[in-house]
């Protein structure tokens, strides 16, 4: 968490450095931007953001395709925003146990609640495939371009699955379509709810306070990744699965 705090603080500080405004992928972080981060107090080597075996990017997850999260323990605990857990919290709430209204916490592993159609993805690799894509889509209309990108995504995913069947590839345009990156993800589908605060705390201030600083709100919820007990790898939900043990957190 200390590393993540430093990263976030470093990135937020760039708002005051006019020449370095904007958002950048860790894979493609320009040297002037990194130097600006250093001038604001960031002390880690650049490959600790992306590239090193224990880089910060290895602990950050795509949370169910619509949020982000961070792994914070050797037993696979993941912190994300409070609203990112709404689907799971609502699904488990009843009249007798209104977890959205009153919050929830699991006293031990056995009380952690499984969730259908929720997952986390770890970014394993990101590469610039702009030249390859531009060659394929030159002169094509929007529909044909989408078809070509889908085909390329499927082909790259098939190659990635030869390395690990839990891998898949996503191709996305960046910088208003001037760049295309292919990102390889590893997907874990057994994700269980561990803790959430009452909605009155998690949504305190509502949209009035959203995007403001400081905020007086408990904007977080906690989940745990579960894995195959034999491989520590991804697995569909099973009562026999065990908490995931990440190499870094």
Per-region residue spans from a language model:
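Terminal presequence/propeptide segments associated with secretion/organelle targeting
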Residues: 2, 8, 15-249
